[in-house]
């Protein structure tokens, strides 16, 4: 009888565990949706294999600052004295070609970044499967929510991971706003507020323009307005260019033609407006907003701008008017371990150390503060990139290295849901851009729209169908 009761109790307990587990697994937040539609992990049920104690050598290649790479390599070797890290230096121009040449001779680095088009890396079988390590690593729970599920290109295997993060940044000239007696927007500004401000800050009689672009409205609008997980309205399953992309393309075109957008570099219009066709509009003091990237923070602190009375301050890309997320476009560099590496476990640890681990970031912060060039000057005038993890100590450490201004506090608080651009994150995307978006029957779609040759709304459905077709064909070609 006791044995029977014990068995019944055991069965009941097991049933309870199964029910609770299933209930827990069914609760998935929007932030857990992958760019490929979602990826579950079993971190609680797996353990990372031990690192080898053998004497081994790992090679590493990225286009990050070489002195920083060497500093991190030295710190990694201090932690693992049995591992030698060799840095492979390549020119960033033609990066993927250089990797192709190395791979052809069996010398693909154990850990490497690939540039732009992920199809090249997949087609050439460069990407090693790190699923076993990534899914079992408890450190990865601290990754920024939108960074956890990228890199599962076939929906199953972790083939790449985010290694570097520069957010899209909208710079506002605070002095110009003050000059025109226009109040600076809230750090929680919305997309429509940005569009309205561009028009309000355009003063033709004073030769003042609302904005200038490096980054684009057509990239921002679908991500922030559709709570998308990628460019062109990518929702984890498909693209949609029929709404916000088309609206943004037409809006930008109207602004170019009406003088809200500053004259383009090296044009007759720039010559007429600034007296120098080669003068960057952002350095004239006559542009209210510069749509750009985080790496420009340091440039805008240079005397070229300060001495002209230009005070560029950073804002995050505004939130969509009806958005439920803080998703914002970002330049994300992706890293991978080589499919040919003899030491995948150790290569994974090296990739993480250089990319997103807290320990690696602690060393990065120290490097930003202390590394000097041959003349004794600091190599980094400001931190290079933002953390890929949530750890507040790391964010606080980075904040301490930035100017003492509330704009930086406001920015960092709202820059923790980056969305990577398509080429490096989505199979088929770059091929679609090359063959359709910039080189298809419409020519350069954005240029044709700006010139009034096509209406973005008229071609958006065709572009949507082709974008989804290119993705499907890429998945079939690359994985099946």
Describe each PLM feature range.
Residues 47-65, 83-88, 110-111, 159, ...:
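Short, well-ordered beta-strand elements
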Residues 237-272, 313, 317-320:
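Glycine-centered hinge/linker elements that transmit conformational signals in sensory
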Residues 299-307, 323-329, 337-440, 478-479:
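C-terminal lobe and pocket-closing loops
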Residues 18-21:
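C-terminal motif of bacterial Sec signal peptides marking the signal peptidase cleavage site
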Residues 75-143, 178-181, 280-281, 285-289, ...:
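Extracytoplasmic "Venus flytrap"/periplasmic binding protein-like
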Residues 116-169, 313-316:
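Hinge/lid segment of periplasmic solute-binding proteins
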Residues 155-163, 168, 193-250, 278, ...:
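Extracytoplasmic/periplasmic solute-binding protein
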């Amino acid at each position: 009888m006791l044995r029977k009761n014990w068995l019944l109790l055991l069965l009941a307990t097991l049933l309870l565990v199964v029910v609770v587990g299933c209930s827990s697994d069914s609760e998935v937040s929007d932030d857990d949706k992958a760019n490929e539609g979602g990826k579950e992990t079993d971190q609680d049920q797996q353990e990372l294999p031990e690192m080898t104690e053998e004497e081994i050598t790992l090679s590493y290649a990225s286009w990050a600052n070489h002195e920083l790479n060497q500093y991190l390599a030295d710190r990694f070797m201090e932690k693992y004295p049995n591992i030698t890290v060799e840095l492979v230096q390549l020119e960033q121009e033609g990066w993927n070609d250089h990797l192709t040449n190395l791979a052809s001779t069996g010398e693909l680095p154990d850990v490497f970044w690939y540039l732009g088009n992920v199809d090249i890396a997949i087609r050439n079988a460069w990407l090693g499967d790190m699923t076993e390590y990534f899914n079992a690593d408890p450190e990865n729970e601290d990754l920024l929510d939108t960074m956890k599920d990228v890199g599962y290109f076939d929906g199953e295997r972790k083939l790449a991971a985010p290694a570097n993060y520069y957010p899209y940044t909208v710079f506002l000239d605070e002095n110009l706003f003050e000059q025109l007696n226009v109040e600076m927007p809230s750090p929680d500004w919305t997309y429509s507020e940005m569009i309205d401000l561009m028009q309000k800050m355009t003063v033709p009689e004073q030769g003042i323009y609302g904005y200038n672009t490096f980054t684009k409205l057509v990239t921002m609008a679908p991500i922030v307005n559709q709570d998308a997980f990628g460019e062109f309205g990518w929702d984890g399953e498909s693209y949609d260019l029929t709404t916000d992309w088309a609206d943004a393309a037409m809006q930008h075109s109207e602004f170019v033609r009406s003088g809200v957008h500053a004259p383009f570099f090296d044009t007759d219009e720039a010559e007429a407006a600034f007296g120098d066709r080669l003068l960057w509009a952002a350095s004239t003091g006559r542009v209210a907003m510069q749509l750009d990237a985080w790496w420009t923070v340091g440039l805008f602190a240079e005397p070229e701008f300060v001495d002209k009375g230009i005070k560029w301050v950073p804002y995050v890309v505004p939130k969509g008017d009806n958005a439920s997320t803080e998703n914002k476009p970002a330049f994300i560099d992706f890293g991978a371990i080589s499919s040919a590496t003899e030491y995948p476990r150790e290569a994974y640890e090296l990739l993480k150390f250089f990319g997103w681990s807290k320990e690696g970031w602690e060393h990065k912060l120290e490097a930003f503060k202390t590394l000097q060039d041959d003349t004794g000057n600091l190599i980094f005038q400001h931190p290079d990139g933002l953390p890929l993890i949530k750890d507040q100590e790391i964010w606080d450490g980075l904040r301490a290295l930035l100017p003492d201004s509330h704009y930086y506090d406001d920015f960092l608080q709202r820059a923790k849901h980056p969305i990577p651009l398509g080429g490096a994150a989505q199979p088929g995307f770059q091929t679609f851009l090359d063959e359709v978006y910039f080189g298809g029957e419409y020519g350069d779609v954005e240029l044709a729209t700006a010139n009034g040759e096509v209406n973005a709304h008229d071609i958006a459905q065709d572009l949507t169908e082709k974008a989804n077709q290119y993705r499907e064909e890429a998945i079939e070609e690359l994985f099946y």
